[in-house]
Amino acid sequence: MEQQHGILVLNKPKGLSSAQCVARVKRLGQKKIGHAGTLDPMATGVLLVLLGNATKLSGYLLEGGVKTYGGTLRLGVTTDTWDAEGSIVSETALSEDDLARGSALEQAARREVEAWLDVTEQPVPPYSAAKHQGQPLYKLARAGKEVPVKVKSIHVSHASVQWVNMPDVRFRVTCSSGSYIRSLAHSLGIRLGCGATLTELTREYSHPFGLDVAHTLDEILAEPERLPEWIMPISAALPGWKNISVGKVQEAHLKNGMPVPHLPEFGTFESGERALILAQDGSPLALAEARMDRERPVWAVLRGLFTH
C-alpha cells in the first residue's frame, strides 16, 4: 500500500505499548509513521497515529490539547509503578466499616477525586519515560538506582466519580496533555493514608478526536485496504487553525521556505495567529504563523507539509 498522509485514530488495545501498535500499522506499507501522546501498555483508548506529512504535527497536537480519561483505582494497594503493572509495595487491610457502602473512606475518596480540580502540580512516576540527565527514569528505577523526584505542572478541568464498589473507585478526568493519571491515583492514596493504585485506564478523548471515530487494531489489520477511508485529514486535527488557500506563486514561495505576504482574501490577520496553508487542490502545504516582517504582514512557515 502506498504511503498515506493524515491521522489514524486508533483504539489501542490493552497489553501493547504505543510503539508496538505503531509498528503493526507500519507493516501496512506506512514507512513514515509516528504517534502523538503515549499510552501505557495497560491503558486502552484513543491513540493518534500520524502518517506521512502528519508526522510533523506531533508537537502542535500536544500543544494545549486536552485529554479525557475513564479509569479505576483501587484503595489499599500501592505499587512501584503506581499502576497494576507494577509490583506491590504495600497493602493496607481495609475494615468491614471501610468497605461498607457509604463509608467514611468512600466519602473521603469521592472528595479527593473531586479535589483533583485544584491540582496544579504532580510528581512524575519513577517508572516513566521522563528523563534525568538524559536517562529515562524507568531505566534508573529498573537498575535499582535512586530516582530523583520530578514535578510537572498540569491542569485538571473536570474530575468526577462514576461509581464506587469498595475498594474500587471509578472516575472520569479531563486534563492537560502530559498529565499522569497514575500519579493522581497514587497521590490520592497517600492523602487518604491507605494507598491506592491505578488498575484500569481508557483514554476517551485526545483533542480533537474521541473514541467515536477510533478503529481497533484488529479491524485495521483485518481490512488494510480500508485504511485510506479511515484516515482523518490534517485539517481535522487542527480545528482552531485558520485554513488559507494559496495560488501557484505563493505555493512556490512556501516550498522555498519563504513567507507568504498576507492578502485580503485570506481574511483577518492577527500577529501570532496560526494557519494551515493549502494548495489550490486542497492538499496541505505548510503550518504557518502570522508575523510582521518590516511592518509587512506575512505568514511565516513553521513546518512544511508538502510531499513533493
Give the residues covered by each predicted segment.
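RNA pseudouridine synthases
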Residues: 1-183, 187-213, 287
